[in-house]
From Swiss-Prot:
Chain's gene name: atpB
Similarity annotation: Belongs to the ATPase A chain family.
BP GO annotations: proton motive force-driven plasma membrane ATP synthesis
Bilayer disposition of the protein: Multi-pass membrane protein
Primary subcellular site in the record, as a coarse category: membrane
PANTHER family: ATP SYNTHASE SUBUNIT A, CHLOROPLASTIC (PTHR42823:SF3)
One Pfam match: ATP-synt_A
Annotated GO MF terms: proton-transporting ATP synthase activity, rotational mechanism
Keyword Transmembrane in record: yes
Keywords assigned: ATP synthesis, Cell inner membrane, Cell membrane, CF(0), Hydrogen ion transport, Ion transport, Membrane, Transmembrane, Transmembrane helix, Transport
Compartments it resides in: Cell inner membrane
The protein's assembly and partners: F-type ATPases have 2 components, CF(1) - the catalytic core - and CF(0) - the membrane proton channel. CF(1) has five subunits: alpha(3), beta(3), gamma(1), delta(1), epsilon(1). CF(0) has three main subunits: a(1), b(2) and c(9-12). The alpha and beta chains form an alternating ring which encloses part of the gamma chain. CF(1) is attached to CF(0) by a central stalk formed by the gamma and epsilon chains, while a peripheral stalk is formed by the delta and b chains.
Keyword Membrane carried by entry: yes
Name of this chain's protein: ATP synthase subunit a
Length: 217
């Protein structure tokens, strides 16, 4: 069962994210605090995609917003005792990365047709085969870097936090200051949780933009 814990926690993260959105309800003249937070988040995501892709970026707004919520709540689960965060498992981060990877290539061909292949050929025709190989390696590298970045940061952060807590509560000399240190560490961890969700979102947006936005020459 422990081998599938990341699947269970992933489902929980998705359910929580969906529940938060549904709890916000329909837009109102006087929005609740939760609705204000959700609307602010959606506006932030909207600004992100339109700045990188223009109005056509709105097509990808649901995807980017959903990715952000999933990664955020997946990361938050790391703060729960005896729970392995789904984003601290390489299978989860790799699956999420592959969704983005295949989607932006699909969209690249949908928008540009076979002309999308020119993105891999470089500016010099004589060196096209060389550039093609380099670009393929670069795109595959995105899968590795995007999935490992999130996994390593969340897994490493969890191990470090547990280790420090163990040292604090296991030593009578540090036990007295442990509450202050713990508050500081948790604050830093929360900032890291938000930052990692943002990084995954912005990189996903940039990768999609690179595939669908026509460059001006």
């Amino acid at each position: 069962m422990e081998h599938y814990e990341h699947v269970i926690t992933s489902i929980v993260a998705m359910v929580v994210a969906l529940g938060v959105v549904l709890a916000a309800g329909k837009p109102k003249i006087m929005p609740s605090k939760l609705q204000f937070v959700i609307e602010s988040y959606i506006n932030f995501c909207k600004s992100m995609v339109t700045e990188n892709m223009g109005e056509q970026g709105l097509r990808y707004l649901p995807l980017i917003a959903s990715i952000g919520l999933f990664v955020f709540f997946g990361n938050v689960m790391e703060l729960l005792p005896f729970v392995d965060a789904p984003t601290g498992n390489i299978n989860t981060t790799l699956a999420l990365t592959l969704i983005v990877f295949f989607l932006y290539h699909f969209e690249g061909f949908r928008v540009n047709g076979l002309g999308y292949i020119k993105h891999f050929m470089g500016p010099i025709k004589a060196l096209a085969p060389f550039f093609f190989i380099i670009e393929i390696m670069s795109h595959l590298g995105r899968v590795v870097s995007l999935s490992l970045r999130l996994f390593a940061n969340m897994k490493g952060g969890a191990i470090l936090l547990i280790s420090i807590i163990g040292v604090l509560i296991g030593n009578p000399f540090t036990l007295a200051v442990s509450p202050i240190v713990l508050v500081f560490l948790i604050t830093i961890k929360v900032l890291a949780i938000v930052l990692q969700a943002f990084i995954f979102m912005i990189l996903s947006t940039i990768y999609i933009a690179g595939a669908v936005v026509h460059e001006e020459h």
